[in-house]
Amino acid sequence: MHELSIAMSIIEMAEEEADNRGVQIDAVHLKLGTLSGVARDALLSCFEMACENTRLQGSRLVIEEVPVVIFCASCQAQHPLHSMQLFCCPECGTPSSEIVQGKELEVVALEIKECAPNLV
């Protein structure tokens, strides 16, 4: 299960950024492509488990799923791919292996916890 090692890498990166900025992380926002080879539910479970006893304990992993989009050389256009069975243009049927998006595994944002102001 490589999702655990991915979750641990995400946590390590977020902790390093939190340390550098002196903040607490409330959520990690991630783009996850359909063709990334990562199981969304497994990654969510692994993230929750791996956060225990870290600075990110209690934080959330927010995943934006990125669909597959191909470029068709015949149409000279990008098209979302609705079936993973055939990598063909949905408009003209031309086979295409040029994937424009859908392989992402990218941390795009860290949501910082709001701290209550110190009352004097």
Model-derived features with residue positions:
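Cys/His-enriched microdomains
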Residues: 70, 87, 105
